[in-house]
Amino acid sequence: MYRGKKGHTTTARHIAVLELVRPLIPSDAEVILLGDGEYDSVGMLQWIEAHARWHLVVRTAQNSLVQYGGHLFPLSDLPVEPGISLTLENIGFTAQDCGPLLALACWELDCEDPIYLISNLDDAKMALKYYKRRYRLETLFSDKKSRGFPIHKSHLSLPNRLSRLLLAASLAFIWMIYLGLSAIVTGQRTLIDPTHRQDKSLFRLGLDWLTHLPKWGQPIPLSFFLSPDLLFHKSVR
């Protein structure tokens, strides 16, 4: 945590965080860094190439410049249409010609606008497949804020106190996932979600389960470890 204004932070701060994370990752692990437009800087790309040697797929702006075929132009010049994805290989990113990289313009039918990605992967389909996993993180943010734990309303302003709150909320998040899985595996999901389909997330099921257990006089299980019995149970989708 650090004290700053709302919005994007600097490349230097992102790299400082990644420097802390990098020693925790096994040296033989394959790492795919997924990020939004804050991670598309030349400085970030150069750091990954020089220090981490990870794969990455990050979003970039439509006015980002790429060099391709001897021309420098913004990605918005690509003739992409709804339902169509375009890929440029061996591009140089920005006027600094950082690369070679992939540039992707993807416009899915259910989206109002295309998104633009850059990646150091060789396979455009795999790059897009990996990037789609990033959307799962958005549910984590909403679960910790507006849809679950309203930590954004804590009114805490000191970075060290916010760090402790975030740590506690993260442990509680894992606990809610455990409770949600437990409700499904034990066949009691219908007590808190009486529908024929599962509309609620595992987190939401766990939070509702925590609310109802004391009402029924049942003990509240506390665990942060998801056993194989829970993870691979036939009832869990």
Label every model-predicted segment:
Residues 1-237:
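Single, function-defining residue in the core of a domain
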